[in-house]
Design a protein with these regions (language model features):
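Active-site-proximal beta-strand elements of phosphoester/diester hydrolases
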Residues: 9-21, 46, 119-121, 151, ...
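CN hydrolase (nitrilase-like) catalytic-core segments centered on the catalytic cysteine
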Residues: 64-84, 162, 168-273
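Short beta-strand scaffold segments in enzyme catalytic cores
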Residues: 84-86, 105-109, 150-153, 241-243, ...
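Active-site catalytic loop in hydrolytic enzyme cores
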Residues: 92-183, 196-205, 209, 288-291, ...
Length: 298
């Protein structure tokens, strides 16, 4: 793909991964995906939820600072903005340790110089009964919810972009997307690890709905495939990484849960879904249907 670096055009990549429990293996995949995306002209790379490890939240949290520094270095080395999916963190944004032995689910944005631009702590925690191997999910048993919405500033090609940050289950809450738009967001990041069942039912619909609610591009990075745990159990995620335009149309997507050619020695344990935000086209679309000028209940 040719580089797209015109003024007020931002090229983004939603990454689909199949993260397992081995953190070092996952980091190798993340690094390769970032280098690949950068070579294709991407300016913002969005990794999925639990990108560094699936199923080892507390062990991963012990390495939060180290892993964050690694992500910062990946961003700096490739000269891109990196939305580092999510990492479990043992402390709140003010440095206070999370009480009750819980963690925060943290999404971070790193700039091309490696500096951290923003930290968002996932507000809505997944609680559901699902007809899969696990059966029920209660994220609040492990995580404390965040309390603050976050809109971060990106600068590329002499243009400024505002990124509203979300994580996975946040997609089910239109008020968050609307509040981010009201705070100036032009695009929304949604690193996710939807279960196969809930993803099959709602993933695409939720991405399109939140795009319509906010009139923002929505970048849905995703975990996809089977994730094996040390106790012999496993979890299946939906994948289908997708980027949706402000008007709810799907710009680009990966139409599978599984990554292809897993028997090939050259197989990459990730795929990239690239898309371009045309800032002026989005502004014009919002002007043609100014829903936030008409909003009365928010």
């Amino acid at each position: 793909m040719n580089e797209i670096r015109n003024n007020e055009h931002l090229t983004v990549a939603a990454v689909q991964m199949n993260s397992q429990q081995n953190i070092e293996d996952n980091l190798a995949d993340i690094k390769a995906a970032i280098i690949d995306a950068s070579k294709q002209g991407t300016q913002l790379v969005v990794l999925p939820e639990n990108c560094c490890s699936m199923g080892r939240q507390f062990a991963t949290a012990e390495r939060f600072d180290e892993l964050s520094n690694t992500m910062a270095e990946y961003a700096r080395a490739s000269g891109i903005y990196l939305l580092a999916g999510s990492l479990p963190c043992p402390y709140r944004p003010d440095g206070v340790i999370v009480p009750d032995g819980r963690l925060r689910q943290v999404s971070q944005l790193f700039a091309p110089d490696g500096m951290r631009v923003a930290r968002y702590d996932k507000i809505h925690l997944f609680t559901a009964t699902v007809a899969d191997k696990q059966g029920s999910y209660n994220e609040a048993a492990t995580f404390e919810p965040g309390t603050q919405t976050v809109v971060a500033t990106l600068e590329a090609n002499d243009a400024v972009y505002q990124l509203g940050m979300m994580v996975c289950f946040d997609l089910r809450f239109p008020a968050l997307a609307q509040r981010l738009r009201q705070a100036g967001a032009e695009l929304l990041s949604a690193p996710s690890a939807f279960t196969y069942m809930t993803g099959q039912a709602h993933w695409s619909l939720l991405l399109r709905a939140r795009a319509l609610d906010s009139q923002c591009m929505v970048i849905g990075a995703a975990q996809g495939g089977e994730h094996a745990y040390k106790d012999g159990s496993s979890r299946q995620t939906w994948g289908h990484a997708t980027v949706t335009a402000y008007d709810g149309t799907i710009i680009n997507s990966y139409e599978d849960s599984e990554l292809k050619d897993t028997t090939n020695k050259e197989h990459k344990n990730y795929t990239l879904v690239l898309a371009t935000l045309d800032k002026q086209a989005q502004i014009q679309g919002r002007q043609k249907m100014p829903i936030f000028d008409c909003h009365r209940l928010g």
